[in-house]
């Protein structure tokens, strides 16, 4: 039995094209997407001359249309291919059982404010005490043997609008214990001098790790997002080039520290600014615990980060988590503080994209992780990171239709994807004129996981009507539909 349709309507603010343009034929790109001669649906008929002339003589209506963005309606109905549900149900149940073994969020964590006005009286007192110790140390040259200004991440320890935020990181890392925080600060400054961090930042290091670690976009709260892709080390040539001997492991550590230092210097250390990073760790095809060189290098890097880079991680998301990682977490979990645990999020392969979307908007998530954002080196002339996307959950055995009502002549460009696909997708234009034919933009197509992750279409609209994007999910698993569109003037 078909379910009752459920509809949500929202108005999407878009850049509006001018309505005063003359009608034109459908573009060549659109013609390619239209039905062939063997299909029964045909191109929409042209508007007759009297109606066109009548439209151009009503400037009042044109003015109204100029300020009327497209209206979007999302409608859910029963799947027309529901018979496939039973065929896949048993396999999905097994997958769900495995997925349930992976822990999700291990506790709630709310990032502390970096505004001085939000500090408690005891926290303000601790900050003042730490600043006093720093002042004494500077006067007595405890940090350096020369009277030069001491900076960390390019910021002076005192007498700068950003200094308090830096000192607060050390205080929070040591639970506002002033002496412990000061000791940590001294050790960090000493290590930075020995490691020659300021010189390292300016070096031109050569590495092949641009696909292993990279920054891409921001989360919903404005934190820059760093992706760590461990599966790249399945490449034996890259692995040996990075970890085969002690010298190469040292070089790997230097490149990682340089990357982190450069990323930190782009953060906002002003009061109330964003001074932490969202870390995404992709565990897909990770070499695992058997690679002792990787394990040793990772352990060394983690220790350095904990000792010298306090409170720079907002959240640690582990995605595509394999079963063996549960063993690893069981070992290290008891040694982690509740505060550290509360920053961790885990997701298996089937829930990785959905988990990322909780924290990062789809337009900011790279295509390879279920989002719409292409590599910064690639060119996407139609969309940017600033073009927001909408998300819909397509329930098992249902069909979701996105209805975009057009009020003026324009070219509509859209991107659409369903994580993992395994659905049917079609697109069509339905004119407002009753006697006009529906135009098939994309005939029904069964999408497989091996198909292109993101579909991009465009359609020139020469009369009032609506574009319908329909996704039919016949499986027993809910899907995440993501789409966005832009309106271009003709």
From Swiss-Prot:
The modification Phosphoserine is found at residue 108. GO terms for molecular function: lipid binding. Residues 1-121 are annotated as: Disordered. Residues 57-69, 79-100, 109-121 have a biased composition (Basic and acidic residues). Keywords: Acetylation, Cell cycle, Cell division, Cytoplasm, Isopeptide bond, Lipid-binding, Membrane, Phosphoprotein, Transport, Ubl conjugation. Residues 353-487 form the GOLD domain. The modification N-acetylalanine is found at residue 2. Residues 19-33 have a biased composition (Polar residues). Residues 202-377 form the CRAL-TRIO domain. Residues 1-17, 46-56 have a biased composition (Low complexity). GO terms for biological process: cell division. It comes from the Eukaryota. It is a peripheral membrane protein. Pfam families: CRAL_TRIO, CRAL_TRIO_N, GOLD_PATL1_C. The keyword Zinc does not apply. There is a cross-link at residue 193 (Glycyl lysine isopeptide (Lys-Gly) (interchain with G-Cter in ubiquitin)). GO terms for cellular component: cytoplasm; plasma membrane. It is found in: Membrane; Cytoplasm. The keyword Ubl conjugation applies. Carrier protein that may be involved in membrane-trafficking events associated with cell plate formation during cytokinesis. Binds to some hydrophobic molecules such as phosphoinositides and promotes their transfer between the different cellular sites. Belongs to the patellin family. 'Patella' means 'small plate' in Latin. This is Patellin-3. The lineage of its organism: Eukaryota, Viridiplantae, Streptophyta, Embryophyta, Tracheophyta.
């Amino acid at each position: 039995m078909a379910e009752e349709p459920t509809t949500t309507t929202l108005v999407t603010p878009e850049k509006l094209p001018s309505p005063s343009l003359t009608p034109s034929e459908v573009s060549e790109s659109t013609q390619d997407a239209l039905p062939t001669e063997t299909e029964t649906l045909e191109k929409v008929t042209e508007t007759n001359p009297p109606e066109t002339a009548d439209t151009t003589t009503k400037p009042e209506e044109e003015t109204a249309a100029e300020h009327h963005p497209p209206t979007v309606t999302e409608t859910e109905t029963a799947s027309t291919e529901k018979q496939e549900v039973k065929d896949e149900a048993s396999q999905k149940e097994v997958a769900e059982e495995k997925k349930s073994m992976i822990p999700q969020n291990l506790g709630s964590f709310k990032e502390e404010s970096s505004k001085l006005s939000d500090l408690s009286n005891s926290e303000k007192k601790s900050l003042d005490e730490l600043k006093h110790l720093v002042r004494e140390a500077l006067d007595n040259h405890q940090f350096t043997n020369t009277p030069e200004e001491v900076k960390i991440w390019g910021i002076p320890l005192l007498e700068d609008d950003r200094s308090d935020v830096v000192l607060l990181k050390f205080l929070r890392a040591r639970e506002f214990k002033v002496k412990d925080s000061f000791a940590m600060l001294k050790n960090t400054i000493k290590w930075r001098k020995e490691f020659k961090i300021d010189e390292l930042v300016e070096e031109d290091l050569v590495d092949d790790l641009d696909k292993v670690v990279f920054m891409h976009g921001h989360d919903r709260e404005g934190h820059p997002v760093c992706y760590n892709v461990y599966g790249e080390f399945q490449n034996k040539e890259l692995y040996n080039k990075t970890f085969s001997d002690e010298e190469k492991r040292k070089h790997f550590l230097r490149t990682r520290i340089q990357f982190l230092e450069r990323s930190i210097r782009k953060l906002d250390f002003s009061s109330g600014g964003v001074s932490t990073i969202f870390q995404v760790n992709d565990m897909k095809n990770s070499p695992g615990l058997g690679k002792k060189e990787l394990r040793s290098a990772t352990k060394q890097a983690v220790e350095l980060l904990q000792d010298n880079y306090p409170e720079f991680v907002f959240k640690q998301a582990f995605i595509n988590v394999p079963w063996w990682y549960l063993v690893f977490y069981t070992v290290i979990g008891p040694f982690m503080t509740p505060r550290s645990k509360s920053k961790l999020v885990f997701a298996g392969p089937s829930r990785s994209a959905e988990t990322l979307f909780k924290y990062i908007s789809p337009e900011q998530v790279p295509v390879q992780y279920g989002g719409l954002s292409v590599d910064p080196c690639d060119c996407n002339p139609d969309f940017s990171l600033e073009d927001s996307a909408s998300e819909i959950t397509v329930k098992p055995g249902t069909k979701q239709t996105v209805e975009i009502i057009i009020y003026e002549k324009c070219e509509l460009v859209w991107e659409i994807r369903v994580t993992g696909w395994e659905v049917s997708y079609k697109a069509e234009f339905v004119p407002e004129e009753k006697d006009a034919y529906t135009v098939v933009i994309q005939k029904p197509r069964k999408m497989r996981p091996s198909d292109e992750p993101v579909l991009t279409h465009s359609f020139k609209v020469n009369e009032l009507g609506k574009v319908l994007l329909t996704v039919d999910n016949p499986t027993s698993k809910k899907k995440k539909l993501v789409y966005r569109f832009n309106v271009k003037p003709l």
